[in-house]
Amino acid sequence: MRVALVGARGHGARHVENLVRLGHDGLATFVGVVDVADVDVPVPSYPDLPSLADELHPEVVVISSPPATHRDLVLTAFELGCDVLVEKPAVLSLTDFDEISAEAVKRGLVCQAGFQTQGTGSYRRLCSLIGSGALGEITGIGAAGRWVRTDSYYERAEWAGRQGEDGTLVNPFAHALQNALLLADVEERTDIAVELELYRCRDTITADDTACVRVTADGAPPVVVATTLCATTSLPPVVLVHGTLGQAVWWYDDDRLTVNDHRMAVAPSVDLLENLIRHRQTGEPLVAPLAAARAFTSVAEQCGKADVPLLPARRVGDRVLLDGIDEVVVRAAEKIATFTELGCGFGR
């Protein structure tokens, strides 16, 4: 299939590498890119998607541009008759989510969201364990994200650190939130309740750099995700599945899963673009359909509107540290508790 890429810099560079690989494997033809800057790619570059489509006629468009541009680009791709793989967050409001979903159905097209950890073997194995009852009744899903980030992190793009487009739950730890919602089986529900505690330790940003969210729904285990970019030491993001018969610990970035401290064998990962192409060719189910990002989009939209108070923190060179947060985010995931319930000085 003929594939075009919108946004070839930053994370988009990974898509360039993947498209070149798929071309060598004979699975896709990488026809061109759209980018506002000059980019070093082995295919023609265009200033906008219609111009590219007029000459190159893509069948699939991969979108890896700033989040605020996603809605318009997805709709443009649909108008051109293309299926879409769009990076997370796919969209920033439920209104946009519903509009894109309806347009896809109307045109007979598909939209895959860029939650690549849904394609990992560890995710599929964990879903199987939960479904089989191996962990017993699931009593809660916790996730913790703890990274060290310097000032340069917020200088990488104009939208970085901007509320409504960035934030720990919406961007760097979006996978933690999405994975927890999936494992709680609430990803498509419209009746979730969301409790947010968002904070920022830098006065140069408007989005949160430290956050906790609890998501609940009738008949589903509670979800708590706690995150920070103001840690003293980084920790690979982790999802904890608490059950009456045991606990699963999933390090999704490493495709690693343990159950009651035993390492589980997992199948190879599935590439999202390969999956989308096979969906079109053979009917293989999509790994990360947009429909499965409804609850995530609801939380993301609320993050864009919530208060984000400034916390006192320590500056150490080009880093900002929030004392105590390293332990707090882990405890929140372990206890399925919010910052406030843990008695943090900065909890509400």
Residue ranges and their predicted role:
Residues 28-30, 282-295:
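Glycine- and charged-residue-rich phosphate/anionic-cofactor binding loop of Rossmann-like
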Residues 171-286, 300-304, 316-348:
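Contiguous beta-strand/loop segments that form the cofactor/metal-binding neighborhood of enzyme cores
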Residues 42-48, 260-263:
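Active-site regions of enzymes building and remodeling cell-envelope glycoconjugates
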Residues 2-4, 31-34, 44-47, 52-56, ...:
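Internal alpha/beta domain cores that form substrate/cofactor-binding pockets in large enzymes
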Residues 60, 66-67, 71-118:
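Beta-strand-loop-alpha-helix segment that lines the small-molecule cofactor/substrate pocket
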Residues 120-197, 201-203:
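Predominantly a Rossmann-like dinucleotide-binding segment in NAD(P)-dependent oxidoreductases
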Residues 1-42:
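N-terminal Rossmann-like dinucleotide-binding module
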